[in-house]
């Protein structure tokens, strides 16, 4: 049985979306056991009238909620009864609990995970790796996307190793193509950090490094993993998601601007619906925090039930892949760590 904690408060649609996503995940995965943390009365209210296996879902009362504007260091110290911190403590202390999912504050989650759960042996800094769809029907992982603003070339090599293993063992991509986000494709492009990182990645046989990537090629389908610092990665992901949403809005507005466009849209309704689903980030779950000793998945703050369900599925697949041991084995081959 795979046991996963769900932090049910802190997101824009909490706790309803978290509860509905949890119930949907239970229906799909018969060997899954979920533990919901949060205000018990609110969670019981959300569960009323819902059909689910009561033997595989439990509630742990946590009356406090962490706001996105609160300082991470403060909430770890002062909000020990919050849904997030209680989930992190349980993940650390209980050997039979495998993973946790949260749609709450990113800063608080990273700080709590690093100080309370710890890292895989040899990992310098854990990193987020969200998934986006590509134009050829595949997916691409972006690592890092927000955990580390300041990085070194060695950090980028570790991000590449971790995310490459993730794409291989969780998403079944046999030989993930790894690219380095840069301002140009030539090896000498970028600042000193990127130039040194390019050399390190080229000298790392455990990954299939294919060179630099410009941001415009992110969704081209030519890459399976893109490594970068957390600031650039976060901007890249959010710009891509935002552009897709705005294009859909413009398309809808244009369709309603003329009767003939409405007629054409009616004939192409099925295609438009498929494209809308393809570009909807809710269908791709959240960001796995690679490199922590236990699995942590961070969902969008705006996650609805579908996204929460996908986050749970990510955590489940991570646990069934035994990725942490594989990650430690490769990373420990390199001795020059920068702690």
Model feature map: region roles:
Residues 6-16, 76, 147-157, 298-303:
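Short, glycine-rich nucleotide/cofactor-binding loops
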Residues 1-44:
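N-terminal phosphate-binding or glycine-rich loops at protein starts, especially the Walker A/P-loop
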Residues 51-96:
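Phosphate/nucleotide-donor binding subsite
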Residues 32, 56-57, 140, 207:
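Short, conserved active-site loop motifs that form the nucleotide-linked donor/cofactor pocket
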Residues 14-18, 81-91, 99-113, 124-129, ...:
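Short glycine/serine/threonine-rich phosphate/pyrophosphate-binding segments
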Residues 16-17, 29, 33-35, 41, ...:
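Glycine-rich phosphate/diphosphate-binding loop of Rossmann-like nucleotide-binding domains
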Residues 114-128, 134-142, 222-226, 230-339:
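Glycine-rich phosphate/nucleotide-binding loop
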């Amino acid at each position: 049985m795979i046991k996963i904690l769900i932090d049910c408060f802190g997101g824009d649609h909490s706790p309803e979306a978290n509860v509905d996503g949890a119930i949907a995940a239970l229906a799909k995965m018969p060997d899954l056991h979920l533990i919901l943390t949060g205000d018990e009365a609110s969670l019981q209210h959300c569960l009323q009238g819902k059909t689910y296996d009561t033997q595989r879902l439990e509630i742990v009362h946590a009356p406090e909620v962490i706001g996105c504007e609160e300082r991470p260091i403060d909430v770890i110290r002062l909000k020990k009864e919050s849904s997030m911190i209680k989930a992190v403590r349980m993940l650390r202390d209980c050997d039979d609990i495998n993973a946790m999912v949260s749609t709450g504050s990113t800063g608080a989650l990273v700080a709590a995970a690093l100080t309370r759960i710890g890292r895989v042996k040899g990992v310098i800094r854990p990193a987020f790796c969200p998934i986006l769809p590509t134009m050829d029907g595949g997916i691409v992982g972006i690592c890092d996307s927000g955990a580390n603003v300041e990085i070194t070339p060695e950090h980028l090599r570790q991000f590449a190793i971790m995310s490459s293993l993730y794409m291989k063992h969780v998403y079944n991509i046999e030989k993930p193509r790894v690219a380095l986000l840069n301002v140009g494709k030539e090896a000498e492009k970028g600042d000193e950090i990127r130039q040194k990182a390019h050399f390190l990645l080229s000298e790392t046989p455990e990954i299939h490094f294919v060179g630099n990537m410009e941001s415009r090629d992110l969704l081209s389908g030519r890459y399976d993993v893109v490594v970068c610092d957390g600031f650039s990665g976060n901007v890249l992901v959010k710009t891509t998601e935002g552009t897709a949403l705005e294009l859909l809005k413009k398309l809808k507005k244009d369709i309603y601007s003329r009767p003939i466009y409405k007629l054409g849209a009616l004939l192409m309704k099925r295609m438009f619906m498929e494209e809308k689903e393809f570009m909807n980030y809710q269908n791709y779950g959240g960001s796995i925090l690679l490199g922590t000793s236990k699995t942590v998945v961070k969902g969008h703050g705006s996650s609805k039930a579908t996204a929460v369900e996908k986050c749970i599925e990510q955590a489940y697949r991570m646990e069934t892949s035994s990725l942490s041991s594989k990650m430690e084995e490769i990373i420990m081959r390199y001795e020059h760590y920068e702690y």
